[in-house]
């Protein structure tokens, strides 16, 4: 059996591809592999950006593997580090993750996409949370989706399970950009290369600030930032990269980021 998760690196970018028959559904073993992959990415100082995509032209990911569940995988089983799909609960993921959705993205697959920082979609991609139709709750999406798109659109998706095509998902802000299917991965790499050329310490600080602010009142969050109470912000202030950014601007040249 081939590996369900394939990876390749180029420069500072890691590409992660879900490749499971028949629709890239995720079982416990695959989730644990994804967790290990993203944890290694998080902890590798040479890697700055990740792209998550899937091998099929029809399916990105439908979420939980129902066949595996019927064969004995427990819904509350060991998903591995990072929870389902390796990203949703991975602590301190302070590097940008791009999701390149190349087909049907629903249920837990959409929850994984929502755990990424930027979502690009092929023009034929579709999105849904169909759990309601099987009498279950899209647990992580119930928390995340109303924070990502207008509340009433999120509630319609959660309450009815209706599908959005790529253009509508883009219109509501769920998707950053829609591309022809043949261009999706080249556009994802273009975005990844752009981010990989940027300042990693600033990215880390931005991601921690955003995470912290989601559960804090604005003033409390602002005080935590300005008081340098967040580890990544404290590391950023006074770093070589921060000074390099100032110097490069003053000298009208491109900065050289070192992550120090």
Locate predicted features.
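C-terminal alpha-helix plus adjacent terminal tail
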Residues: 1-11, 44-45, 57, 161, ...
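Crotonase-fold acyl-CoA enzyme core
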Residues: 91-203, 239, 244-247, 252-253
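Short, active-site-adjacent cap segments at secondary-structure transitions
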Residues: 57-61, 106, 128, 210
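Terminal peptide-recognition signature
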Residues: 16, 33-34, 52, 65, ...
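Short active-site-adjacent helix-start/loop capping segments
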Residues: 25, 59-62, 68-69, 107
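Conserved CoA-thioester-binding segment of acyl-CoA-metabolizing enzymes
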Residues: 1-57
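An acidic, glycine-rich surface segment that forms the CoA-thioester-binding/catalytic face
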Residues: 31-43, 66-105, 137, 142, ...
């Amino acid at each position: 059996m081939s590996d369900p998760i394939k990876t390749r690196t180029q420069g500072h970018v890691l590409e992660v591809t879900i490749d499971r028959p028949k629709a890239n559904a995720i079982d416990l073993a695959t989730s644990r592999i994804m967790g290990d992959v993203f944890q290694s990415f998080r902890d590798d100082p040479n890697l700055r950006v990740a792209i998550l995509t899937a091998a099929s032209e029809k399916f990105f990911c439908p979420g939980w593997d129902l066949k595996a569940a019927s064969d004995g995988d427990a819904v509350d089983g060991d998903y591995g580090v990072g929870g389902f799909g390796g990203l949703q609960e991975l602590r301190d993921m302070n590097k940008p993750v791009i999701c390149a959705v190349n087909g049907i993205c629903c249920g837990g697959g959409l929850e994984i996409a929502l755990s990424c920082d930027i979502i690009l979609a092929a023009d034929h991609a579709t999105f849904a949370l169909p759990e309601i139709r099987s009498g279950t709750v899209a647990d992580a999406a119930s928390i995340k989706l109303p924070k990502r798109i207008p509340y009433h659109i999120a509630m319609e998706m959660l309450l009815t399970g209706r599908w959005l095509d790529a253009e509508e998902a883009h219109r509501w802000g769920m998707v950053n950009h829609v591309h022809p299917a043949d261009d999706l991965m080249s556009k994802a790499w273009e975005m990844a290369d752009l981010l990989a050329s940027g300042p990693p310490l600033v990215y880390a600080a931005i991601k921690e600030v955003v995470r912290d602010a989601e559960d804090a009142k604005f003033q409390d969050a602002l005080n935590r930032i300005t008081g340098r109470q967040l580890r990544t912000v404290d590391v950023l202030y006074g770093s070589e990269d921060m000074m390099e950014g100032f110097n490069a601007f003053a000298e009208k040249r491109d900065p050289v980021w070192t992550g120090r």
